[in-house]
């Protein structure tokens, strides 16, 4: 049974939503991913949101661009946490999506990550689930420890080769 529902409004959102799925997989969290347009398929959307709780979802990660009603409507129907991912758009750089998701009325909150913030949405979903799963909490602590060690290794490399040498390369990994 999937613990997290990942829903997006368009297949063009897949690269961002895949980052959330990747994090969930790394942490051993089951999920179900689907594409539903809240505007073009309202009947399909309503059935998805209404049935999410009985499917066993504890969190929904919803990504959408432009008018971005998908996350807010999920939050209006699904009684548990919804994480919204505003998608970058060509017309307004994603600000339209961001404002649509964060400006929710009282009583219908959507936890919102950065524009195209798929990875952080996955991490936030994991943190929500970890409040009642000690083993997952330990995996999250390990994940955070690995992030810290990665930064420390990059700094050690920078100190070893100097900024002048590094400047000619894109990242420490390119050396």
Describe each region flagged by the PLM.
Residues 12, 97-161:
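C-terminal binding/interaction regions
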Residues 21, 46-47, 76, 93-105:
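Active-site-proximal loop->helix
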Residues 13-17, 42, 67-73, 92-95, ...:
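Short glycine/serine/threonine-rich phosphate/pyrophosphate-binding segments
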């Amino acid at each position: 049974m999937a613990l997290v529902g990942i829903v997006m409004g368009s297949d063009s959102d897949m690269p961002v939503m895949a980052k959330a799925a990747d994090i969930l997989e790394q942490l051993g969290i089951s999920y179900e991913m689907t594409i539903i347009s809240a505007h073009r398929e309202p009947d399909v959307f309503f059935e998805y949101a209404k049935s999410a709780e009985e499917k066993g979802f504890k969190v929904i990660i919803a990504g959408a661009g432009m008018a971005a009603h998908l996350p807010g409507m999920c939050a209006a129907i699904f009684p548990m946490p919804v994480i919204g991912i505003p998608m970058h758009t060509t017309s307004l750089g994603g600000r339209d999506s961001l404002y649509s998701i964060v400006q929710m009325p009282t009583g219908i909150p959507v936890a919102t990550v950065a524009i195209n913030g798929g990875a952080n949405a996955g991490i936030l979903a994991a943190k929500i689930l970890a409040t009642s799963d000690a083993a997952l909490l330990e995996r999250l602590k390990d994940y955070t420890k690995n992030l810290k060690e990665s930064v420390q290794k990059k700094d050690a490399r920078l100190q070893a080769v100097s900024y002048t040498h590094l400047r000619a390369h894109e990242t420490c990994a390119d050396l």
